[in-house]
Amino acid sequence: QPSPVPVGATVMVWIYGGGFMSGTASLDVYDGRYIAATQGVIVASMNYRTGAMGFLSLGNSEAPGNAGLMDQNLALTWIKENVASFGGDQSKVSIFGESAGAASVSYHLLSPMSKNLFQRAIMESASALSPWALLPDAEAHRRGVELAKAVGCSTDSDIEETIECMRGVPALTISENEWVVWGLCQFPFAPVVDGNFIREHPTVSLQTGNLKQTDVMVGFNNDEGVYFLLYGAPGFSKDTQSLITRDQYLEGIKMSVMGINDISVDALSFQYIDWVNFDQPSMYRDAIDNLSGDYNFICPALSFGKAMASFMGRKTYQYKFVHQASNFPWPKWTGVM
């Protein structure tokens, strides 16, 4: 909080990212003192369960999914009830988050359980429309069963017995076996339409206006795809210039867009190749960066923002971040991640 302690200050609540698989509010990069000191606002955050601990969904009341989002909801409830004691105004709360945190922010806009807990929202690099931000029920159930098998719990018996077995498994064992499914820009556990916190598919809510209609800001960075490409795409490494070949480019498309067929690979390849600068050594690298970033982060953010902008009487803002800091720890070619 600012010093001296204000009265009726705006409140900003941060929700960290991490693919719904990891993260913590205590990272130095999330230190809210700088915003509080320079802008005179109250900055709050919370930890929430991630991975299987936060998003295991087996389709019953014992493992319904979205526990991590419910953690966030509980924190928002506490903040609304208590922030006045810290100099904040409960009627001036803005929630903001990055990546999975941005997707979380959009889910709070969509959920009737959260809509009265804040006033405005900022989504940085993603939304609930991101392909990794929502799992179909059947796929979420399959992944939960695979995890149960991996930690030695039988899935042949009643599902309640399986869950009871998993409760006896050490947390470290659970976390060590969570990556039962892997794909570039894909995460094993994520939110589901549970009929409680998330009551319908996000696209339905956006089409019907069945969500909190308020002022929002959406944005993204210039090179959203690079960070994930460095963790598994063919030919990518932070220790090289990652000047990939055409074959590696095509393979990267298949990894970035899961389940894509060959015709779609060819279409995307043609669309993203820079035909004007075709002879540039970095051309294929930059093309897959743009494709992966568009598919996983930029287009979902813009689509969500466009839908919000269609509601009368509300303001929607958009930004694109293109500045690379002088102390940026990654190679210069990685751009603005």
From Swiss-Prot:
InterPro entries documented for this protein: AB_hydrolase_fold (IPR029058), AChE-related_enzymes (IPR050654), CarbesteraseB (IPR002018), Carboxylesterase_B_AS (IPR019826), Cholinesterase (IPR000997)
Residues with glycosylation annotation: 290
A Gene Ontology cellular-component term: extracellular space
GO biological process: acetylcholine catabolic process; choline metabolic process
Keyword Glycoprotein: yes
Enzyme Commission numbers on file: 3.1.1.8
GO MF terms, alphabetically ordered: acetylcholinesterase activity
PROSITE patterns for this protein: CARBOXYLESTERASE_B_1 (PS00122)
Keyword terms, alphabetized: Disulfide bond, Glycoprotein, Hydrolase, Serine esterase
EC category name: hydrolase
A Pfam family assignment: COesterase
Catalytic activity: an acylcholine + H2O = a carboxylate + choline + H(+)
Residues forming the catalytic site: 99 (acyl-ester intermediate), 224 (charge relay system)
Annotated disulfide bonds: 153-165
Similarity remark: Belongs to the type-B carboxylesterase/lipase family.
Name listed for the protein in its UniProt record: Cholinesterase 2
Species this protein is from: Branchiostoma lanceolatum (Common lancelet)
